[in-house]
Amino acid sequence: MVGVREQDRERIADVIAQEVRDAEPGEVPERLCAAAVRLLPVSGASVSLRGEGMPVPLSASGARAAYLMEVQATLGDGPCLRAAETGAPVFASDLTTGRDASLWPVYAQQAAAAGVRAVYALPLGDRSVCVGTLDLYRDAPGELADDDISTARFVADVLTVALMALPRGEEAGRLGDGLWLSPLATDHDEVYQAVGMVMAQCGVTADEALALLRAHAFAEGRTVLHLAHDVITHTTRFDPD
């Protein structure tokens, strides 16, 4: 564990081992989120995969972390998306004021309303290959200590290895079966189905269709996932202007 003090190694390894013991493959990301909360001065954690045009929420330590994960997917903006795009950590240590609040004003407002004041996003991978992010949430503003950053990086590395090792393709049947993915991830298939339907209804590109979904979801105070479900069940229709 590069950067982790010798005296902390056994404690970190023990917590991770406790959390993942007897876990099914699809449970591993959620268990590692729980380990991150136990090991770090944070109130929540989530993990998202890097998807086509938007992140795919995979697992979270609780309802609030899952909600904030969905908020970024809906807005298409936030520190976690920046980390996925750059392959570098993004630490928003104070979403209530200053630089962080001005960089992501809408997300910062939504996070603060949910009681989160700081978000720390670590890439799962690096600048050359980034498969997603580990996102950490804290109720109070402030920077992570160096030891905590080292621990967070290690948990992110473990998550990266775990995600790459999860069965997929022929090992787990068709990807669409969601045999290893959590419900959060498989539910996001509906977003891509809705993008296709909006493309057909409005005669627009995939990027434009996703932008329309996001704009309508935000205007209605909903997540893009909830709106997508209405689109594919024909409850909501997008008509060309």
Model segments located where?
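Short hydrophobic/aromatic beta-strand element in the GNAT-like acyltransferase core
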Residues: 44, 108, 121, 133
